[in-house]
Design a protein with these regions (language model features):
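Conserved, structured core segments of small domains
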Residues: 1-103
Length: 103
């Protein structure tokens, strides 16, 4: 049995990237869908500046993902559209120990 690393990604958006974020979003979602299909996506979502006003923009995103190694995660991040297109200013990577929900 391979033990996967569970990793929390806190991704911070650059200011003024809402339009670009929305344009690139389908590519970003496609990659997350692939991780989900492979059973390696624990959770993912955007962090809106105002949950009632989509035009307010985003602070960034949170993703909790599973990879075999840190190197595999780094390779995956190299192709992340939000990073490649300059939407994310940076990504903080930290280990994550899932406690709940069980299963």
């Amino acid at each position: 049995m391979v033990l996967l690393l569970t990793i929390h990604l806190s991704c911070t958006d650059n200011e003024g990237t809402l339009e670009k974020r929305l344009a690139v979003r389908p590519q970003h979602i496609e990659r997350l869908q692939k991780l989900d299909d492979e059973g390696r996506l624990v959770a993912a979502g955007a962090m809106p500046k105002d949950p009632n006003d989509p035009q307010a923009g985003f602070y960034g995103s949170t993703m909790i993902v599973e990879f075999d190694t840190r190197e595999a995660l780094d390779e995956w991040l190299k192709e992340e559209p939000f990073l490649k297109e300059g939407i994310y200013s940076h990504v903080d990577v930290k280990p994550f120990n899932k406690a709940f929900p069980k299963g």
